[in-house]
Amino acid sequence: MKALVTGADGFVGRHLLEHLRAQGDDAIGVDRECDVTDAASVLAVLDRVRPEAIHHLAALTAVGASWSNPVEYTRVNVLGTKNVLDGASRVVPTARVVLVSSADVYGVVRPEDLPLVETFRVAPANPYASSKVEAEHVAHDAVRERGQAVVIARPFNHLGAGQSTDFVVPAIVNRLLQALDDGADEIVVGDLSTRRDFSDVRDVVRAYRLLIKSGVGGEVYNIASGVDVGLFDIAQRLRTAIAPHVRLVTDESLIRPVEVPVSCGSYDKLFRATKWRPTITLDESLSDVIDEMRRRRGES
């Protein structure tokens, strides 16, 4: 299958390209050379590649940064999605598309609501999540008005080797490794009272490929582990593995204006459609992040 991946130079995009090629797909990745906010640029890429499958990953994804630039998040995440789907309808109307949304669209939930299912209401609590809700609306319009085969994926938190330090796990790992370098006895962290559902990025990209094959157009699928874990627990595991003597000190300036206390999803619908289930443990994922960041810092 010829597959196009937008946002291919990003953390997930790189893993997805590797997985698709390992499965025998003819996978072509585009990133900054295809400006998804420019309809002509998107059309040119689609006309050149003529994909049978499109994985639309290109997006702004840092939740914290979305508060300072919500307009740009809307431009990239919503207009970008519209341009990809409009272009596909013109050039490759039968192509199957996976739109990568986010579990952040669910917003603040109660513990008794967990694990979240796809029919649960959406109530975005930050500009990033709002942009993803709007992108989902664009996808539903494409399905309803043009009959495009667009499947919406809502991944919960994911992690793995190569993730940016804009995200919590690699950020903590980086600070712990820096503390070892500096001989420091403490690092600053943000709010560790929250609980999140983490999947390994390799499990996540495997789900994307399965959804291209077996997902139903217009349907939404959670990608989740089904288990919520406290960020404090994760930070302690990382501290024990890297620098047990280092204390964790909360810095109020690192706390987001609105924080979702707990998030956890059900992957039952995804399993029914594709037989997907998570295969990589959290401890394996954390170990991979540590090893990769040590290599990146020349500390292997």
Where are the language model's segments positioned?
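Amphipathic terminal alpha-helices
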Residues: 282-300
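NAD(P)-dependent short-chain dehydrogenase/reductase
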Residues: 109-114, 138-197, 201-210, 228, ...
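Conserved C-terminal active-site "lid" loop/helix of NAD(P)H-dependent oxidoreductases
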Residues: 201, 220, 233, 252-284, ...
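Adenosine-cofactor binding site in Rossmann-like domains, unifying the SAM/SAH pocket
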Residues: 27-42
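Mid/C-terminal beta-alpha module of Rossmann-like enzyme folds, strongest
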Residues: 172, 214-255, 297
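NAD(P)H-binding glycine-rich loop region in Rossmannoid oxidoreductase-like domains
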Residues: 40-76
